[in-house]
């Protein structure tokens, strides 16, 4: 999430643009680059900074997160407010795959798709959560990332080439192969909910370019 958060702050003009985090575990890099680097050593300690985004702590913390699955609905609120007030700021929700299994996140997706709000939802599908993810939506995302064609191709590549000084190059090839094989299935659910879906980003170097393209060229 570090590269993604740096990319978001490079492309979007926070605090005018609203970057909304789901819970606080993805927001540490955000806190460090928004004036709290020295205070971060006291993160989650008595009299230290909060472990979660906190509006009273920084103007860059657009929404006070705590409970999971709230980011999409909160970002939708900012987007609707911008439209009603005639303000030009953008609204972004960053949510992990664990939080996306919560009912409030699904409600937010449904309402956002209907509203056609000018906002961006980023799914950080890192397969990390405090407890094991459960539910139909998790199973859907799991099927996307465990496509058998991708795994078979990956196994053949590594079995055939083994250890090599070109390992880094081969890892990039595998990532590109994964992107190609799953791109056709990844967006069906989100498109059905009314979203314009963009293929996932597997290479950190492409984060800034992809975000700039979306920020400048698309109104949702």
Name what the model sees in each region.
Residues 25-26, 36-40, 46-49, 116, ...:
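Alpha-helix initiation and N-capping motif
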Residues 91, 119-120, 197:
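Hydrophobic anchor at the start of a short beta-strand
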């Amino acid at each position: 999430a570090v590269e993604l958060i740096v990319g978001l702050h490079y492309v979007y003009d926070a605090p005018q643009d609203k970057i909304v985090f789901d819970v606080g575990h993805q927001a540490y890099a955000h806190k460090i680059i928004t004036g709290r680097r020295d205070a971060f050593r006291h993160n989650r300690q008595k009299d230290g900074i909060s472990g979660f985004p906190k509006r009273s702590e920084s103007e860059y913390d657009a929404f006070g997160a705590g409970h999971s699955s709230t980011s999409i609905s909160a970002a939708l609120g900012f987007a609707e407010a911008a439209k009603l007030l005639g303000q030009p700021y953008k609204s972004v929700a960053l949510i992990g795959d664990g939080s996306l299994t919560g009912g409030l996140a699904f409600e937010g997706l449904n309402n956002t798709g209907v509203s056609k709000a000018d906002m961006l939802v980023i799914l950080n599908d890192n397969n990390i959560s405090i407890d094991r993810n459960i539910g139909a939506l998790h199973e859907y995302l799991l099927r996307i990332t465990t496509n058998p064609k991708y795994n078979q191709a990956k196994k053949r590549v590594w079995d055939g080439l083994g250890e090599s000084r070109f390992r880094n190059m081969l890892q990039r090839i595998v990532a590109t192969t994964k992107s190609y094989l799953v791109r056709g299935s990844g967006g069906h659910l989100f498109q059905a909910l009314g979203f314009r879906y963009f293929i996932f980003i597997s290479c950190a170097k492409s984060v800034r370019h992809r975000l700039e393209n979306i920020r400048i060229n698309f109104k949702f």
